[in-house]
């Protein structure tokens, strides 16, 4: 059985951050990422990259972090008592892209690696990650393309990965207090450590690289659609759901804040502008209403 190689994982994560930032800058043509290197007092650090006020992207955050410590926070050991008393390392790349044009969806991707070690015992390790899409105005062909790429990433590794991780994504990115999916899903997986390290690491590399294949063609197709105040106001309203999910339900946000992570980097996923409206309901049969009836539903897209 192949042993975990932390240095290989870190090298891939750093190069993935580079390639995604380069691709986003290339398509935006106006704004560039600003890098913020940071250190964590309790151990580790990272590099946060933010692009703001671009021609295509209102805000894009692509974060690499590598944190370590002698003991895990409560959020990590609550479901895994076997991790108590182990030193840990957690590293990953996390990104959220908020476009300016409401016809381009928001996208999120994440790949991460976790290892907990104790003298005289085998390490406990796993990978997690995925990518998901949050449209404001739905286009069926875009969602089908997104899920086709997700399936093509999974199929070489296991014929049941796509169905399993698609369902996990639908279940995870769900606002229980709204009884509503956050978007149209994609892939989400966690605790991946079988059959061995090499298999899992190769899959995670495919997920990380597959994100751009899934997202950029949608951006190219929708970036020139004209939009006005009506579309902008709906986009700002729907962005509120992103805020609600991240602050109420997201385990990564909770883990980051509880483990003494860097707050600015953890909350970089927040949209730059948001609008909340009391008891808003879209007019029936409008494009806004169709988002709810045709897209924010559990559906097999491919």
Swiss-Prot record:
Q: Active-site positions, per UniProt? A: 108 (proton donor)
The prosthetic group or cofactor this protein requires is: a divalent metal cation
UniProtKB keywords: Cytoplasm, Heme biosynthesis, Metal-binding, Oxidoreductase, Porphyrin biosynthesis
What reactions does this protein catalyze? coproporphyrinogen III + O2 + 2 H(+) = protoporphyrinogen IX + 2 CO2 + 2 H2O
Important for dimerization: region residues: 242-277
* Binding positions for a divalent metal cation per the UniProt entry: 98, 108, 147, 177
A cellular component annotation (GO) from this entry = cytoplasm
Could you tell me which InterPro entries the record lists for this protein? Answer: Coprogen_oxidase_aer, Coprogen_oxidase_aer_sf, Coprogen_oxidase_CS
Q: Give GO terms: molecular function aspect only.
A: coproporphyrinogen oxidase activity; metal ion binding; protein homodimerization activity
Q: In which pathway does it act?
A: Porphyrin-containing compound metabolism; protoporphyrin-IX biosynthesis; protoporphyrinogen-IX from coproporphyrinogen-III (O2 route): step 1/1
According to UniProt, residues marked as the site described as Important for dimerization are 177
Compartments in which it is found: Cytoplasm
| Enzyme Commission identifier(s) | 1.3.3.3
The UniProt similarity line reads: Belongs to the aerobic coproporphyrinogen-III oxidase family.
Which HAMAP family does this entry report, sorted A to Z? Coprogen_oxidas
Q: What is this protein's record name?
A: Oxygen-dependent coproporphyrinogen-III oxidase
